Amino acid sequence: MENNIQNQCVPYNCLSNPEEILLDGERISTGNSSIDISLSLVQLLVSNFVPGGGFLVGLLDFVWGIVGPSPWDAFLVQIEQLINERIAAYARSAAISNLEGLGNNFNIYVEAFKEWEADPDNPVTRTRVVDRFRILDGLLERDIPSFRIAGFEVPLLSVYAQAANLHLAILRDSSIFGARWGLTTINVNENYNRLIRHIDEYANHCADTYNRGLNNLPKSTYQDWITYNRLRRDLTLTVLDIAAFFPSYDNRRYPIQSVGQLTREIYTDPLITFNPQLQSVAQLPTFNVMESNAIRTPHLFDVLNNLTIFTDWFSVGRNFYWGGHRVISNRIGGGNITSPIYGREANQEPPRSFTFNGPVFRTLSNPTFRPLQQPWPAPPFNLRGVEGVEFSTPLNSFTYRGRGTVDSLTELPPEDNSVPPREGYSHRLCHATFVQRSGTPFLTTGPVFSWTHRSATDRNIIYPDVINQIPLVKAFNLTSGTSVVRGPGFTGGDIIRTNVNGSVLSMSLNFSNTTLQRYRVRVRYAASQTMVMSVTVGGSTTGNQGFPSTMSANGALTSQSFRFAEFPVGISASGSQGASISISNNVGRQMFHLDRIEFLPVTSTFEEEYDLERAQEAVNALFTSTNQLGLKTDVTDYHIDQVSNLVECLSDEFCLDEKRELSEKVKHAKRLSDERNLLQDRNFRSINGQLDRGWRGSTDITIQGGDDVFKENYVTLPGTFDECYPTYLYQKIDESKLKSYTRYELRGYIEDSQDLEIYLIRYNAKHEIVNVPGTGSLWPLSIENSIGPCGEPNRCAPHLEWNPNLDCSCRDGEKCAHHSHHFSLDIDVGCTDLNEDLGVWVIFKIKTQDGHARLGNLEFLEEKPLLGEALARVKRAEKKWRDKREKLEWETNIVYKEAKESVDALFVNSQYDRLQADTNIAMIHAADKRVHRIREAYLPELSVIPGVNAGIFEELEGRIFTAYSLYDARNVIKNGDFNNGLLCWNLKGHVDVEEQNNHRSVLVVPEWEAEVSQEVRVCPGRGYILRVTAYKEGYGEGCVTIHEIEDNTDELKFSNCVEEEVYPNNTVTCNDYTATQEEYGGAYTSRNHGYGKSYESNSSVQADYASVYEEKADTDGRRDNHCESNRGYGDYTPLPAGYVTKELEYFPETDKVWVEIGETEGTFIVDSVELLLMEE
């Protein structure tokens, strides 16, 4: 009876919500926070396993900087809910409290480390980082045992792994940087020994506890297997994956970056719909069936290529579902492997075959439960199956029947959530197994997906600049007697077991270097007896080498069981090569375990010996004696950096001890160089970073990191379009650092320059213009590896050398800058006076459009005491300077008094907050002109540097600016000087705004029908003065009218043919007004800002004003400076004849008036319009 059939579909997520699990009657949302954090950490360990601040910051960002009490609790709950076991309250509280404390102390340690890394020679930073290390190290030694409290080891295991990883990271820091921190050799070695001991201890605990946690779970029902698999998966992600990288913290075994891979397989939940609260497990496979059918036996690593799905159906209601499938994969370097049929090769629909051509990083599945009512008298039938899946690769999606809602990313989230999942995914689909159970009246079927970590690449790529770790399960062939077995838990995947006496395995390698490169080879192994092994790559072999036993016969595999078989003879290879491992002398057929093979790039012996000898000679030549107490005076900072490059390029494999010794000597030389250098911020950390010290410069200067010429930061100075506003860089050497009657030297290195001016200024200016032609890159065209993999310069590649000895002499015993890359300029210092604090100004300047410069390694250091002629010469220069200073002080007193009186007359009181009622713009300009008669307010060589009279000049100039601001506040006309074009003005017809005489803007009304107007808000009943400065050309009249809506109209008329009545002192008003407007060129508010900012508070305006005058003021009288006239402080151009100023009084009756500008004939030119509020 067809109409009695009921076909009901219950969605997967309605029956079982994987995000919520009941534990002791409490519903807990699990989420994936701990898994997210662990995946991000693994990404860091895979991609950036390099000691230093970058790694520590990553560790802080990914783990310790984002977790707090709640996330740490989530780590614990994640496991608690799976094993159905609560941690005792005291243990939980202690663990979370300890984790918080460790996180806080790690944050402080990272701050101290970064501070030391930025200033490694500072004893304060060294002391701080050592103190923070010892505190954090002590806390970790104390607290890690609290994460393995007896009885709660399993739920605490994920936080144990995080704390252990942190401890190994800082122990590695102390082993690498301890000597530079000031730790003794004994202390450094002790820390290294603890590091090695803890690597084994922590790895063993993680693996043992993992296995114990799984063994303690029940293993009977389907639901037992679900819990078992989830715990296995979660502990793999949060514990074992991290523990797999513990051995890489051995910095002496991994002195450079290493790249590891995780080949383990993990399984997402079966795509079977089941609700344990409502349904019986009798219709589902048992634990043993699930484990044997869903989990693959250990095997060589393979890559999924194709998946063919067969569709089955249940006749009642024609319900189609995934009935079976076949997988085609390949081993790396091997051919395709076709799996047996999983499930049934059904044919209810044509098979669907998917060739992915890329990693499948996501599945969206549609598992369903359909309770079907069969025709009477048949019993109801429960059908569980998968009705559709969408497979996603980074480029495409492949859909079998339909897309579902069960997302694999909920169980295996991305490792990087800052990018789309197609880029930040953590796992890729590796295989699909199948489980089913049928009976009366039910059928349960569903695929189970297995996944591998993305770090396990689909090729065995060997890079020439890192230590390459290749798991041996990535071989493509094993000989008889060799097999893959389960890994012990801390290896990141399965391992190889063999008892052969001969060839063990074959694998395919891809060397990224296209020319022959030499590599050292080592194999991680465990053996109960001596083993003789060899590795062959292409036509190159290591030869047979004997290696000792590592464990007792039949002993358990622990972290201590594994050691490295390091071959003294390396191999040479490039491109694609086959590789094999062989074992000989295994007559007794003892069992050996092999984990991974590692390739370490090395150079030839001859080159290594030559480089070592060359580096030793260069280092010894830096010092005055063999005890390295002092540097030779002619050893420059740049030369020390080049010697440092020589040492850094020595082979770690060939001469590691010698390299370390030479490196310490070079570092000592660098510290001595820094100590004698009187410049602040010698490494260009910032420009304008600190107001009272360091480098100051124009904003167009850039600081760039080291390149093929400079090891450290250097600066680039571009050209300028206006020589009055040059590109500049300067610093003052404080008087307290100088010695009396001593010669000092400025020197450095110029990569290239054009029109670079260098000044040393004390009593007078020592000045040189330096043009140094650049030679382009130091790398010859034949060198292919001049750039490293991250874009950094490869300073170890062969390169061209410039002559470091070029120099020239200006006078016997003196030095000057010239056209060589090394420049030197000296200056003599007479008697020092801390009160005067004259110091020495170091200036670099470019004032041409084609000018440019790149320079670094700057030094200012003591050269020698002055004697004889040089001493007499500096004394004469000092006396001449003091005579000039006395004359200047006498002149300044007179000029200052006049200027101050003129400025004070503008205001009503000494608070300078209110103008006199009769103060007009002409009076302000006249006072300003007197202020600018003060000489030596700024240095003529660079007008941003304050001179001897800067204080009094800025004092008066600040009051002048206040006067301008107060005057502007009385003028209610916006943009009355037309410096902002026609902004705020209404326009009818055609008018122009033109620039005349030093960028002064005027309004030109050329046509009688044109009109310009502005609506102005006023205060009814108050008095206003309308003042207009204008010029009329030709016949007719120019008119400026002010009126209200109705009546109350007044106007000012301008004519060219009739002598107009002018305001008193009209000529002075016109000329001074124009001249001083040109002088300021935008220095005060209404000329320097749009009107959105013109009426802000004086405090914000003053800040802008200070920078303007720091840039522009230049009245030093040391030499003629033609930029003075351009800035308005020398000769100025008055208004042409005919400009007049008129004004009238106006009393509005409403709050709104209109000011209109027009003419009757000819051309009307308006310089400014002012509407001033009368004083009450």
Curated annotation (Swiss-Prot):
One term of GO molecular function: signaling receptor binding
Keywords tagged on the record: Sporulation, Toxin, Virulence
Transmembrane annotation, as ranges: none
Keyword Oxidoreductase applies: no
Keyword Nucleotide-binding tagged: no
GO BP term, pick one: symbiont-mediated killing of host cell
Family to which the UniProt record says this protein belongs: Belongs to the delta endotoxin family.
Function, as annotated: Promotes colloidosmotic lysis by binding to the midgut epithelial cells of insects. Toxic to Spodoptera exigua and Trichoplusia ni.
Note: Toxic segment of the protein is located in the N-terminus.
Protein's UniProt name: Pesticidal crystal protein Cry1Cb
